[in-house]
Protein backbone atom coordinates (compact mmCIF):
# COMPACT_ATOMS: atom_id res chain seq x y z
CA UNK A 1 0.00 0.00 0.00
CA UNK A 2 1.28 3.47 -0.90
CA UNK A 3 1.53 5.87 2.03
CA UNK A 4 0.28 9.28 0.93
CA UNK A 5 1.10 10.97 4.22
CA UNK A 6 2.98 14.13 3.22
CA UNK A 7 5.12 13.75 6.35
CA UNK A 8 6.03 10.12 5.78
CA UNK A 9 9.79 10.09 6.55
CA UNK A 10 10.70 7.78 3.68
CA UNK A 11 8.78 9.90 1.17
CA UNK A 12 10.26 13.11 2.55
CA UNK A 13 13.78 11.70 2.36
CA UNK A 14 13.25 11.03 -1.34
CA UNK A 15 11.36 14.18 -2.30
CA UNK A 16 12.87 17.01 -0.26
CA UNK A 17 16.40 16.85 -1.76
CA UNK A 18 14.81 17.03 -5.23
CA UNK A 19 12.98 20.20 -4.20
CA UNK A 20 16.14 21.80 -2.79
CA UNK A 21 19.16 23.72 -4.02
CA UNK A 22 22.38 23.88 -2.01
CA UNK A 23 24.45 27.06 -2.04
CA UNK A 24 28.05 26.65 -0.90
CA UNK A 25 29.76 29.83 0.30
CA UNK A 26 33.29 29.37 -1.02
CA UNK A 27 34.75 32.85 -1.34
CA UNK A 28 36.58 33.10 1.97
CA UNK A 29 40.18 34.29 2.25
CA UNK A 30 41.10 32.04 5.17
CA UNK A 31 43.68 34.53 6.45
CA UNK A 32 44.40 32.47 9.59
CA UNK A 33 45.88 29.77 7.34
CA UNK A 34 48.60 32.27 6.43
CA UNK A 35 50.55 31.35 3.29
CA UNK A 36 48.37 28.35 2.46
CA UNK A 37 45.71 30.74 1.15
CA UNK A 38 48.00 33.28 -0.50
CA UNK A 39 47.22 31.83 -3.93
CA UNK A 40 43.95 29.96 -3.34
CA UNK A 41 40.64 30.33 -1.51
CA UNK A 42 40.31 28.39 1.72
CA UNK A 43 37.80 25.84 0.29
CA UNK A 44 40.39 24.99 -2.41
CA UNK A 45 43.13 24.11 0.09
CA UNK A 46 44.31 20.49 -0.14
CA UNK A 47 43.18 18.12 2.60
CA UNK A 48 43.50 14.48 3.63
CA UNK A 49 45.98 13.24 1.04
CA UNK A 50 43.84 13.66 -2.09
CA UNK A 51 40.90 15.97 -1.43
CA UNK A 52 40.17 19.69 -1.36
CA UNK A 53 38.27 21.08 1.64
CA UNK A 54 35.19 21.88 -0.48
CA UNK A 55 34.91 18.22 -1.54
CA UNK A 56 33.29 17.40 1.81
CA UNK A 57 30.37 19.82 1.37
CA UNK A 58 29.96 18.79 -2.28
CA UNK A 59 30.06 15.08 -1.44
CA UNK A 60 27.55 15.56 1.37
CA UNK A 61 25.19 17.18 -1.13
CA UNK A 62 25.41 14.33 -3.61
CA UNK A 63 25.18 11.62 -0.97
CA UNK A 64 22.13 13.41 0.50
CA UNK A 65 20.40 13.40 -2.89
CA UNK A 66 20.88 17.13 -3.58
CA UNK A 67 22.11 17.41 -7.16
CA UNK A 68 21.46 21.10 -7.79
CA UNK A 69 24.35 23.02 -6.29
CA UNK A 70 25.60 26.59 -6.57
CA UNK A 71 29.15 27.48 -5.50
CA UNK A 72 29.59 31.17 -4.67
CA UNK A 73 33.18 32.29 -5.22
CA UNK A 74 35.16 35.48 -4.78
CA UNK A 75 38.73 35.50 -3.43
CA UNK A 76 41.49 33.79 -5.50
CA UNK A 77 38.92 31.60 -7.23
CA UNK A 78 40.90 30.17 -10.16
CA UNK A 79 42.18 27.06 -8.36
CA UNK A 80 38.72 26.37 -6.96
CA UNK A 81 37.00 26.84 -10.32
CA UNK A 82 39.55 24.61 -12.03
CA UNK A 83 39.07 21.88 -9.41
CA UNK A 84 35.28 21.91 -9.74
CA UNK A 85 35.43 21.88 -13.53
CA UNK A 86 37.81 18.92 -13.53
CA UNK A 87 36.31 16.92 -10.70
CA UNK A 88 32.61 17.80 -10.52
CA UNK A 89 31.43 18.02 -14.12
CA UNK A 90 29.87 14.53 -14.17
CA UNK A 91 26.34 15.53 -13.15
CA UNK A 92 23.60 15.05 -15.74
CA UNK A 93 22.34 18.37 -17.12
CA UNK A 94 19.48 16.58 -18.88
CA UNK A 95 18.19 15.59 -15.43
CA UNK A 96 18.57 19.20 -14.20
CA UNK A 97 21.65 18.28 -12.17
CA UNK A 98 24.48 20.81 -11.91
CA UNK A 99 27.28 22.43 -9.97
CA UNK A 100 26.89 26.09 -10.94
CA UNK A 101 29.80 28.47 -10.34
CA UNK A 102 28.65 31.91 -9.16
CA UNK A 103 31.53 34.44 -9.16
CA UNK A 104 31.31 37.89 -7.61
CA UNK A 105 30.01 40.39 -10.20
CA UNK A 106 29.36 43.66 -8.33
CA UNK A 107 25.73 43.25 -9.30
CA UNK A 108 24.32 46.15 -7.25
CA UNK A 109 27.28 48.51 -6.96
CA UNK A 110 30.76 48.97 -8.35
CA UNK A 111 31.87 50.21 -4.91
CA UNK A 112 32.02 46.77 -3.29
CA UNK A 113 32.07 43.05 -3.91
CA UNK A 114 30.31 40.71 -1.47
CA UNK A 115 29.77 42.60 1.77
CA UNK A 116 28.93 39.49 3.82
CA UNK A 117 27.60 35.95 3.56
CA UNK A 118 23.99 37.07 3.11
CA UNK A 119 24.99 39.63 0.49
CA UNK A 120 26.84 36.90 -1.42
CA UNK A 121 23.54 35.05 -1.81
CA UNK A 122 21.53 38.23 -2.39
CA UNK A 123 23.73 39.36 -5.28
CA UNK A 124 22.94 36.09 -7.05
CA UNK A 125 19.18 36.14 -6.43
CA UNK A 126 18.28 36.58 -10.09
CA UNK A 127 20.10 33.34 -10.88
CA UNK A 128 18.93 31.51 -7.77
CA UNK A 129 15.25 32.29 -8.40
CA UNK A 130 15.53 30.55 -11.76
CA UNK A 131 16.40 27.32 -9.96
CA UNK A 132 12.76 27.24 -8.75
CA UNK A 133 13.64 25.53 -5.48
CA UNK A 134 11.25 25.17 -2.54
CA UNK A 135 14.09 24.93 -0.02
CA UNK A 136 17.54 26.50 0.10
CA UNK A 137 20.38 24.76 1.93
CA UNK A 138 23.13 27.27 2.77
CA UNK A 139 26.53 25.71 3.47
CA UNK A 140 30.04 26.83 4.34
CA UNK A 141 32.63 25.43 1.97
CA UNK A 142 35.45 25.24 4.49
CA UNK A 143 34.51 22.62 7.09
CA UNK A 144 35.39 18.92 7.38
CA UNK A 145 32.47 16.62 8.24
CA UNK A 146 29.98 14.06 6.89
CA UNK A 147 26.30 15.00 7.14
CA UNK A 148 23.04 13.84 5.59
CA UNK A 149 21.28 17.08 4.68
CA UNK A 150 18.08 15.19 3.83
CA UNK A 151 17.59 14.49 7.55
CA UNK A 152 17.91 18.19 8.30
CA UNK A 153 15.39 18.95 5.55
CA UNK A 154 12.95 16.46 7.08
CA UNK A 155 13.39 18.07 10.51
CA UNK A 156 12.81 21.50 8.95
CA UNK A 157 9.55 20.45 7.25
CA UNK A 158 8.18 18.46 10.18
CA UNK A 159 8.65 21.44 12.52
CA UNK A 160 7.02 23.83 10.05
CA UNK A 161 10.07 26.08 10.31
CA UNK A 162 10.95 29.03 8.10
CA UNK A 163 14.62 28.64 9.02
CA UNK A 164 16.59 25.79 10.58
CA UNK A 165 20.15 26.11 11.91
CA UNK A 166 22.43 23.09 12.40
CA UNK A 167 24.17 23.12 15.76
CA UNK A 168 26.53 21.18 18.00
CA UNK A 169 28.03 21.63 21.48
CA UNK A 170 31.51 23.19 21.70
CA UNK A 171 33.69 23.89 24.75
CA UNK A 172 32.66 27.16 26.38
CA UNK A 173 36.17 28.61 26.10
CA UNK A 174 36.05 28.13 22.29
CA UNK A 175 32.49 29.32 21.76
CA UNK A 176 33.37 32.97 21.11
CA UNK A 177 34.48 31.93 17.63
CA UNK A 178 30.94 30.77 16.72
CA UNK A 179 27.35 31.86 16.69
CA UNK A 180 25.91 30.74 20.03
CA UNK A 181 22.25 29.94 20.67
CA UNK A 182 19.82 29.04 23.42
CA UNK A 183 16.91 26.69 22.66
CA UNK A 184 13.79 25.37 24.34
CA UNK A 185 12.92 21.68 24.76
CA UNK A 186 11.44 21.55 21.23
CA UNK A 187 14.67 23.08 19.80
CA UNK A 188 13.08 26.40 18.93
CA UNK A 189 15.87 28.99 19.06
CA UNK A 190 15.19 31.53 21.80
CA UNK A 191 18.36 33.59 21.57
CA UNK A 192 21.26 33.87 19.12
CA UNK A 193 24.50 35.86 19.33
CA UNK A 194 27.26 35.86 16.71
CA UNK A 195 30.73 35.42 18.26
CA UNK A 196 29.77 36.73 21.72
CA UNK A 197 32.40 37.81 24.24
CA UNK A 198 30.55 35.91 26.98
CA UNK A 199 28.89 32.84 25.42
CA UNK A 200 25.81 31.44 27.11
CA UNK A 201 26.49 27.94 28.50
CA UNK A 202 24.11 25.05 27.91
CA UNK A 203 21.76 24.67 30.92
CA UNK A 204 22.44 20.95 31.29
CA UNK A 205 26.18 21.26 30.55
CA UNK A 206 27.73 24.50 31.85
CA UNK A 207 31.13 23.71 30.32
CA UNK A 208 29.69 23.70 26.80
CA UNK A 209 27.83 26.13 24.53
CA UNK A 210 25.45 25.33 21.67
CA UNK A 211 27.14 26.62 18.52
CA UNK A 212 25.93 27.22 14.98
CA UNK A 213 27.66 25.12 12.31
CA UNK A 214 27.01 27.73 9.62
CA UNK A 215 24.54 25.35 7.94
CA UNK A 216 21.04 26.69 7.29
CA UNK A 217 17.83 25.46 5.66
CA UNK A 218 15.33 28.10 4.52
CA UNK A 219 11.98 28.06 2.83
CA UNK A 220 13.07 29.64 -0.44
CA UNK A 221 10.43 32.37 -0.70
CA UNK A 222 11.02 33.40 2.91
CA UNK A 223 14.77 33.66 2.28
CA UNK A 224 14.25 35.81 -0.81
CA UNK A 225 12.11 38.26 1.20
CA UNK A 226 14.71 38.44 3.97
CA UNK A 227 17.53 39.14 1.55
CA UNK A 228 15.61 41.82 -0.35
CA UNK A 229 14.86 43.59 2.94
CA UNK A 230 18.42 43.24 4.23
CA UNK A 231 20.01 44.48 1.00
CA UNK A 232 19.04 48.10 1.60
CA UNK A 233 19.42 48.11 5.40
CA UNK A 234 22.07 50.70 6.22
CA UNK A 235 22.73 49.26 9.68
CA UNK A 236 23.32 45.69 8.45
CA UNK A 237 26.61 43.85 7.89
CA UNK A 238 24.66 41.66 5.43
CA UNK A 239 25.74 38.49 7.19
CA UNK A 240 23.66 35.43 8.06
CA UNK A 241 25.05 34.96 11.56
CA UNK A 242 25.34 38.61 12.48
CA UNK A 243 22.10 39.96 11.02
CA UNK A 244 19.60 37.54 9.46
CA UNK A 245 19.56 34.73 12.02
CA UNK A 246 19.12 37.06 15.06
CA UNK A 247 16.26 38.78 13.22
CA UNK A 248 14.53 35.46 12.47
CA UNK A 249 15.05 34.32 16.07
CA UNK A 250 13.42 37.52 17.36
CA UNK A 251 10.34 36.56 15.32
CA UNK A 252 10.45 33.02 16.82
CA UNK A 253 10.68 31.46 13.35
CA UNK A 254 14.04 29.67 13.70
CA UNK A 255 14.68 26.14 14.92
CA UNK A 256 17.86 24.29 15.81
CA UNK A 257 18.85 20.98 14.26
CA UNK A 258 21.26 18.93 16.43
CA UNK A 259 24.15 17.52 14.42
CA UNK A 260 23.63 14.18 16.16
CA UNK A 261 20.46 13.67 14.09
CA UNK A 262 22.20 13.88 10.72
CA UNK A 263 25.88 13.17 11.29
CA UNK A 264 27.03 10.24 9.14
CA UNK A 265 29.12 7.66 10.99
CA UNK A 266 30.25 4.19 10.02
CA UNK A 267 30.58 0.91 11.87
CA UNK A 268 30.09 1.03 15.63
CA UNK A 269 31.72 4.44 16.01
CA UNK A 270 29.07 7.07 16.70
CA UNK A 271 31.46 9.97 17.25
CA UNK A 272 30.20 13.18 15.62
CA UNK A 273 33.15 14.59 13.68
CA UNK A 274 33.09 18.24 12.57
CA UNK A 275 36.14 20.44 12.21
CA UNK A 276 36.66 24.08 11.35
CA UNK A 277 40.17 23.98 9.87
CA UNK A 278 40.52 27.74 9.88
CA UNK A 279 43.87 27.92 11.68
CA UNK A 280 47.18 26.33 10.76
CA UNK A 281 47.18 24.20 13.91
CA UNK A 282 43.60 23.00 13.31
CA UNK A 283 44.40 22.22 9.66
CA UNK A 284 47.55 20.29 10.59
CA UNK A 285 45.79 18.35 13.32
CA UNK A 286 42.74 17.46 11.18
CA UNK A 287 44.99 16.07 8.45
CA UNK A 288 46.93 13.97 10.94
CA UNK A 289 43.63 12.75 12.46
CA UNK A 290 43.18 10.75 9.26
CA UNK A 291 46.59 9.10 9.69
CA UNK A 292 45.71 7.67 13.10
CA UNK A 293 45.06 3.95 13.52
CA UNK A 294 41.31 4.45 13.97
CA UNK A 295 40.43 7.94 12.69
CA UNK A 296 37.27 9.60 13.97
CA UNK A 297 36.39 10.56 10.39
CA UNK A 298 36.04 7.56 8.06
CA UNK A 299 36.97 8.53 4.49
CA UNK A 300 36.96 4.85 3.50
CA UNK A 301 33.19 4.49 3.93
CA UNK A 302 31.81 3.16 0.63
CA UNK A 303 28.28 4.08 1.67
CA UNK A 304 29.20 7.77 2.01
CA UNK A 305 32.11 8.36 -0.38
CA UNK A 306 34.06 11.60 -0.44
CA UNK A 307 34.59 12.42 -4.10
CA UNK A 308 37.27 14.58 -5.67
CA UNK A 309 39.03 15.23 -8.96
CA UNK A 310 40.60 11.99 -10.20
CA UNK A 311 44.18 11.96 -11.44
CA UNK A 312 45.80 9.09 -13.35
CA UNK A 313 48.84 8.46 -11.18
CA UNK A 314 51.16 5.48 -10.67
CA UNK A 315 51.11 3.72 -7.28
CA UNK A 316 53.14 5.01 -4.38
CA UNK A 317 56.58 3.37 -4.18
CA UNK A 318 58.94 2.64 -1.28
CA UNK A 319 62.47 1.73 -2.29
CA UNK A 320 65.89 1.27 -0.74
CA UNK A 321 68.74 3.56 -1.65
CA UNK A 322 72.17 2.47 -2.80
CA UNK A 323 73.38 2.03 0.77
CA UNK A 324 70.56 -0.44 1.46
CA UNK A 325 68.41 1.83 3.63
CA UNK A 326 64.76 0.98 3.10
CA UNK A 327 62.01 3.51 2.47
CA UNK A 328 59.23 2.92 4.99
CA UNK A 329 56.19 4.56 6.53
CA UNK A 330 54.23 4.03 9.74
CA UNK A 331 50.73 5.33 10.55
CA UNK A 332 50.73 7.60 7.50
CA UNK A 333 48.72 8.43 4.40
CA UNK A 334 50.76 8.21 1.19
CA UNK A 335 49.06 9.16 -2.08
CA UNK A 336 49.61 8.04 -5.65
CA UNK A 337 52.75 9.10 -7.45
CA UNK A 338 54.83 9.34 -4.25
CA UNK A 339 58.32 7.84 -3.98
CA UNK A 340 59.98 7.33 -0.60
CA UNK A 341 63.61 6.29 -0.98
CA UNK A 342 65.65 5.11 1.99
CA UNK A 343 63.77 7.33 4.45
CA UNK A 344 61.37 6.94 7.37
CA UNK A 345 57.94 8.63 7.36
CA UNK A 346 55.95 8.50 10.61
CA UNK A 347 52.42 9.76 11.37
CA UNK A 348 52.35 12.03 8.34
CA UNK A 349 50.31 12.80 5.22
CA UNK A 350 51.94 12.81 1.79
CA UNK A 351 49.87 14.22 -1.07
CA UNK A 352 50.34 13.11 -4.71
CA UNK A 353 53.74 13.19 -6.42
CA UNK A 354 55.83 13.84 -3.31
CA UNK A 355 59.44 12.66 -3.61
CA UNK A 356 61.33 11.91 -0.39
CA UNK A 357 65.00 11.33 -1.09
CA UNK A 358 67.40 9.21 0.97
CA UNK A 359 68.24 9.48 4.68
CA UNK A 360 65.25 11.69 5.58
CA UNK A 361 63.22 11.55 8.79
CA UNK A 362 59.66 12.88 8.54
CA UNK A 363 57.38 12.92 11.58
CA UNK A 364 53.93 14.47 12.14
CA UNK A 365 54.15 16.43 8.92
CA UNK A 366 51.70 17.33 6.13
CA UNK A 367 53.32 17.56 2.69
CA UNK A 368 51.19 18.94 -0.16
CA UNK A 369 51.52 17.82 -3.81
CA UNK A 370 54.65 18.05 -5.98
CA UNK A 371 57.10 18.56 -3.12
CA UNK A 372 60.67 17.33 -3.39
CA UNK A 373 62.41 16.63 -0.08
CA UNK A 374 66.19 16.63 -0.49
CA UNK A 375 68.49 14.05 1.03
CA UNK A 376 69.10 14.02 4.80
CA UNK A 377 66.23 16.37 5.68
CA UNK A 378 64.54 16.20 9.08
CA UNK A 379 60.94 17.45 9.25
CA UNK A 380 58.76 17.50 12.36
CA UNK A 381 55.38 19.12 13.10
CA UNK A 382 55.22 21.15 9.92
CA UNK A 383 53.14 21.80 6.79
CA UNK A 384 54.97 22.00 3.46
CA UNK A 385 53.05 23.88 0.77
CA UNK A 386 52.68 22.69 -2.79
CA UNK A 387 55.68 22.47 -5.15
CA UNK A 388 58.30 23.30 -2.52
CA UNK A 389 61.81 21.97 -3.10
CA UNK A 390 63.57 21.47 0.23
CA UNK A 391 67.35 21.57 -0.11
CA UNK A 392 69.56 18.76 1.12
CA UNK A 393 70.05 18.66 4.88
CA UNK A 394 67.24 21.06 5.80
CA UNK A 395 65.99 20.70 9.40
CA UNK A 396 62.53 22.03 10.32
CA UNK A 397 60.69 21.68 13.62
CA UNK A 398 63.63 21.24 15.99
CA UNK A 399 64.74 24.83 16.66
CA UNK A 400 61.92 27.28 17.38
CA UNK A 401 64.08 30.39 16.93
CA UNK A 402 65.48 29.20 13.61
CA UNK A 403 62.04 28.16 12.35
CA UNK A 404 60.52 31.55 13.25
CA UNK A 405 63.32 33.38 11.45
CA UNK A 406 62.99 31.43 8.19
CA UNK A 407 59.34 30.40 8.05
CA UNK A 408 55.98 30.96 9.76
CA UNK A 409 55.72 29.28 13.17
CA UNK A 410 52.37 29.24 15.01
CA UNK A 411 51.94 29.68 18.75
CA UNK A 412 51.42 25.91 18.98
CA UNK A 413 54.75 25.29 17.27
CA UNK A 414 53.46 24.22 13.83
CA UNK A 415 55.75 25.42 11.05
CA UNK A 416 54.46 26.43 7.60
CA UNK A 417 56.87 26.37 4.66
CA UNK A 418 55.94 27.94 1.30
CA UNK A 419 57.84 28.49 -1.94
CA UNK A 420 58.06 32.24 -1.36
CA UNK A 421 59.66 31.63 2.06
CA UNK A 422 62.21 29.24 0.57
CA UNK A 423 63.08 31.72 -2.17
CA UNK A 424 64.10 34.28 0.46
CA UNK A 425 66.64 31.98 2.14
UniProtKB/Swiss-Prot annotation:
Name the EC number(s): 2.7.7.27
Asked whether the UniProt record includes Ribonucleoprotein among its keywords, one would answer: no
Q: What is this protein called?
A: Glucose-1-phosphate adenylyltransferase
- Pathway(s) per entry: Glycan biosynthesis; glycogen biosynthesis
Source superkingdom:
Bacteria
Q: Which GO terms describe its molecular function?
A: ATP binding; glucose-1-phosphate adenylyltransferase activity
Family per similarity comment: Belongs to the bacterial/plant glucose-1-phosphate adenylyltransferase family.
A Pfam family that the UniProt record links to this protein: Hexapep_GlmU
UniProt-listed InterPro entries: ADP-Glc_PPase, ADP_Glu_pyroP_CS, GlgC_bac, GlmU/GlgC-like_hexapep, NTP_transferase_dom, Nucleotide-diphossugar_trans, Trimer_LpxA-like_sf
Q: Which HAMAP family match?
A: GlgC
NCBIfam families per record: glgC, PRK00725.1, PRK00844.1
Q: Which Gene3D superfamilies match?
A: Hexapeptide repeat proteins (2.160.10.10), Spore Coat Polysaccharide Biosynthesis Protein SpsA, Chain A (3.90.550.10)
Quaternary structure, from the entry: Homotetramer.
Q: Reaction catalysed by this chain?
A: alpha-D-glucose 1-phosphate + ATP + H(+) = ADP-alpha-D-glucose + diphosphate
- Positions binding alpha-D-glucose 1-phosphate in this chain are 114, 179, 194-195, 212
- GO biological process terms on file: glycogen biosynthetic process
- Class of this enzyme: transferase
Q: Which of UniProt's keywords are assigned here?
A: ATP-binding, Carbohydrate metabolism, Glycogen biosynthesis, Glycogen metabolism, Nucleotide-binding, Nucleotidyltransferase, Transferase
Q: Note the CDD domains from the entry.
A: ADP_Glucose_PP, LbH_G1P_AT_C
Q: Any idea what job this protein has?
A: Involved in the biosynthesis of ADP-glucose, a building block required for the elongation reactions to produce glycogen. Catalyzes the reaction between ATP and alpha-D-glucose 1-phosphate (G1P) to produce pyrophosphate and ADP-Glc.
